[in-house]
Amino acid sequence: GGGGFAWWAFPPGVSRSYEADEWLGAGAALDAAAEAGRGCEFCLGFSQGAMLLAVLLARGRLPDCRVAVLAGAGWPRPFAEDLRSYRDRGGRPVGGSLVQPAVLHVTSEQDRINPREQALEVHRCLGGDVLEHAAGHALPPDGDPAAAALARWAALRLAA
């Protein structure tokens, strides 16, 4: 408990999202995030938010999203089949999506919350680019070259 925001709860005995076979309240979280992302061309998710964003992209529930940044994602185990299905379709849009978004996966070898390998597994399913930084389970801080790289990456894709 760092007192942060949680999109869902865990079943008894589970302490990390990637360990859970079920996310309690995930349906409401997916609906709320899809509604909040309506009309957005740029979406950024961090930690649980990145996992949620990965599921929404795989399901085609953010039809206006052209650019997505997933930072500190873990493997969304209860929704693994959604991501694998997206990969197996060649990343083709589903649902309401007509756009295949550019995706940046922001990872850190020093992430002690969601192991880097899990973010890379999400990357293998959704495709896109990977940005590494040394700040752990966080977005790269201002002044870090990785923060500037993230901003440049997003600006170039939004300008396209």
Residue ranges of model-derived segments:
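Short alpha-helix in the alpha/beta-hydrolase fold that links the catalytic acid
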Residues: 82-83, 114-124
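Short beta-strand/loop motif that positions the catalytic acidic residue
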Residues: 99, 103-107, 111
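Short glycine-enriched nucleophile-adjacent loop
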Residues: 50-62, 68
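Acidic catalytic loop of the alpha/beta-hydrolase fold
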Residues: 76-77, 109-114, 136-138
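Serine-hydrolase catalytic machinery in alpha/beta-hydrolase-like enzymes
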Residues: 1-42
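Catalytic histidine-centered segment of alpha/beta-hydrolase-like enzymes
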Residues: 135-148
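Gly/Ala-rich beta-loop-alpha elbow adjacent to hydrolase catalytic centers
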Residues: 41-53
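A short, hydrophobic beta-strand element of the alpha/beta-hydrolase
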Residues: 68-71, 132
